[in-house]
A protein has these predicted regions:
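Short, charged/polar micro-motifs that form catalytic or ligand-binding hotspots
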Residues: 120-124, 212-213, 225, 251, ...
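Conserved Radical SAM active-site core
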Residues: 166-225, 238-343
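Cysteine-centered iron-sulfur cluster-binding motifs in ferredoxin-type domains/subunits
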Residues: 227-235
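C-terminal accessory extensions appended to soluble enzyme cores
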Residues: 429-481
Length: 481
């Protein structure tokens, strides 16, 4: 007989499969009596018929109940300080959009309803999560302009991010109404999307089973993926670490043992930097952060570790984390202690893709709070088609960052993973865009390096274009090996 734990695990797996199907099995009611169903790559309206609750409806209710606990656990890692929903996911996006759908009429109503089902289908493959702050403050919700809104495109997945073959594979599996077939199709598509590029899982990792959440590719820098920080306030559609968020431990980096992590640092005196990444380390409460980093308040502890970097989007996706969340002051006090008592450099590696992210007083207040704690903020972002592939956007972004005391750091190129084909920009165009943006910028903004790309051997920068033997060629150099 199987143990209770194993039975529970099997039941949970089955219910999650049912939940997958439940999210997309029922046609979407348009609030006015009609329904909308996805057919191929388009949508159509249909007649609405009421009927007694079916077994499928019951399955949907059971599935929704089974995943409710997981949703609550996921968002409980930091205290909410704002609206009803701290995060919008595929499970509650319909509730969030209901007000906008109800307030719309005619074609606008239809477009919003179509978008909702498109999001729910795409989110079966790509992780979807968006903070209520972003939904309320950074997105223009005019249905006519959504496709042109950079923040909407940055955060809301669409089936168009998949190849036509993968779209059809997903739609066929969904149409079968078999949750096992749908789960298998989703897993196969994700595998085709190269979930951990450039040897992320096989290279530059210690062999110890106690060190499953660190990478040591460059001599001076160790990456830490704390297990409790492997989620974000919002998931970027282009995120190259999307595999961290799909619930598959086989492709996930996560460090649970803080003692083993600190021991590793002590065994490697060549290290000077630790980059805490994920996910987002600022999704964690301060107590969890301290379990990994608290000892660095003591200047005699591992003195060769001089720089603590935090890879984060919290600054513009949930700025309340540094201003009004329940433990915001405790977090800032801890960062300040690392600087003033521990003698460490605390660097916030802020992922900022568009100048609109820095347009709110909430973001500016968060910037000032971090700076007052002694942290240095540096900005970086990939260049992505339809989001920020415009020299004027980059020039405005860098100008605003310099105004706020943020140091422009990197312009990256899309990595070979996820929806790379949907978002990538040709190398020649990326180089020209960088040059055009730099020309519009003052010397203070010219700290930004790029366009650069990470690959298996190291980090490469496109330095220029030259004529070699009568042909144009890119001039590149390694920034790190």
């Amino acid at each position: 007989m199987a143990s209770p734990g194993k039975c529970s695990g099997k039941r949970s797996a089955v219910l999650r499969r049912l939940a997958l199907l439940a999210l997309v099995a029922a046609p979407l009611t348009d609030r006015a009596g009609g329904t909308f169903s996805l057919v191929g790559r388009g949508f159509h309206g249909g007649d609405h018929h009421t009927s007694p609750k079916s077994s499928k409806a019951h399955i949907r209710e059971v599935a929704a109940a089974s995943i409710a606990g997981a949703v609550l656990e996921d968002v409980a890692v930091a205290a909410p300080a704002m609206e009803k929903f701290r995060a919008i996911t595929s499970k509650n996006v319909e509730s969030f959009l209901k007000e906008r759908i109800d307030a719309s009429t005619g074609e606008k109503k239809l477009k919003l309803a179509q978008r909702l089902q498109d999001i729910q289908l795409a989110a079966l493959v790509f992780p979807f999560r968006c903070s209520s702050y972003v939904m309320e403050h950074l997105i223009n919700w005019d249905p006519e302009d959504l496709d042109q809104d950079p923040m909407y495109r940055l955060l809301f997945p669409t089936l168009q991010m998949l190849s036509r073959r993968h779209q059809q594979q997903l739609l066929d599996a969904r149409a079968s109404e078999d949750p096992f077939a749908l789960e298998a199709a989703v897993k196969a598509i994700r595998s085709d999307l190269n979930p951990q590029p450039a040897g992320q899982l096989t290279l530059n990792r210690p062999k110890s089973a106690a060190l499953q959440g660190i990478q040591h590719k460059y001599a001076e820098t160790c990456l830490l993926f704390p297990s409790a920080g492997q989620t974000c306030h919002a998931y970027c559609t282009y995120c190259f670490r999307w595999a961290q968020f799909i619930g598959d431990d086989d492709v996930r980096l996560a460090q649970k043992d803080s003692v083993a992590f600190l021991r590793y640092l002590g065994e490697h005196p060549e290290l000077s930097d630790v980059l805490i990444t994920g996910g987002d380390p600022f999704i964690m409460r301060v107590g969890l952060l301290k379990s990994y980093l608290g000892k660095f308040v003591d200047p005699s502890f591992l003195p060769h570790i001089q720089n603590l970097r935090f890879g984060t989007r919290t600054l513009t996706f949930w700025p309340q984390r540094f201003t009004s969340d329940q433990d915001a002051h405790e977090l800032l006090d801890f960062l300040q202690q690392l600087v003033e008592v521990g003698g460490r450099s605390v660097d916030i590696m802020a992922h900022i893709s568009h100048d609109v992210e820095l347009s709110t007083p909430h973001a500016e207040k968060a910037v000032r709070a971090l700076q007052a704690a002694g942290a240095t903020i540096r900005s970086q972002s990939p260049i992505m088609k339809g989001i920020n592939d415009d020299a004027d956007v980059w020039a405005r972004k860098w100008k605003r960052e310099v105004q706020l005391g943020i140091i422009p750091y990197y312009m990256f190129l899309a990595r070979d993973t996820g929806a790379q084909d949907y978002f990538s920009v040709p190398l020649a165009r990326a180089h020209q865009l960088y040059a055009d943006a730099i020309r519009q910028s003052s010397g203070l903004a010219r700290t930004a390096r790029g366009p650069s790309m990470s690959c298996t051997p190291g980090k490469v920068e496109i330095s220029g274009i030259e004529i070699v033997n009568g042909q144009k060629a890119f001039v590149m150099r390694f920034l790190q090996l």
